Design a protein with these regions (language model features):
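Cyclophilin-like peptidyl-prolyl cis-trans isomerases
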Residues: 1-163
Length: 163
């Protein structure tokens, strides 16, 4: 991979998740994430779905799993005819979607544990390089019957970091 895009998620509690994104593997997905981050779309949004031992999901402006940015992007994964060799291991960031392969918009998830059964079905586009303990803290909060944290897990900002 020649190109790497660096990003940071700053949490309300001061926790920082550093990511590297791979535009050579998932160019549409990375471009979309960068566009949303640069427009401050994610600022103030929550991780609305948290399942310890699986993943933490955020990026919905509605905070319940139904919202997006007003557009959808092509799903960059094998079942949709796109080669993507990023495996859904602990710390990998990927796009959430509905049953429609091309329905991803702004919602993303970070794998709390290896979830390789998702490989080829979801557009992985990067990984956590620092702050996996912050992912662990989010994954370990108490949740309701919809897997929504009882205490909000709010992102203050998502920023693209120039190298």
């Amino acid at each position: 991979m020649n190109n790497i895009v660096n990003a940071e998620i700053l949490m309300e509690n001061g926790g920082l998740i550093k990511l590297e994104l791979y535009p050579d593997i998932a160019p549409i997905t990375v471009e979309n994430f960068v566009k949303l981050a640069n427009s401050k779309f994610y600022d103030g949004l929550i991780f609305h779905r948290v399942i310890s031992g699986f993943m933490i999901q955020g990026g919905d402006p509605n905070g319940v799993g139904t919202g997006g940015p007003g557009w959808q992007i092509k799903g960059e994964f094998a079942l949709n005819g796109v080669e993507n060799n990023i495996s859904h291991k602990r710390g990998v960031i990927s796009m959430a979607r509905s049953m429609n392969y091309n329905s991803a918009g702004s919602q993303f998830f970070i794998c709390h544990a290896d979830s390789t059964f998702l490989d080829g079905q979801y557009a992985a586009f990067g990984k956590v390089t620092e702050g996996i303990e912050v992912v662990d803290e989010i994954a370990d909060v108490a949740t309701n019957f919809n897997d929504k944290p009882i205490t909000e897990q709010k992102m203050i900002s998502v920023r693209i970091i120039a190298e």
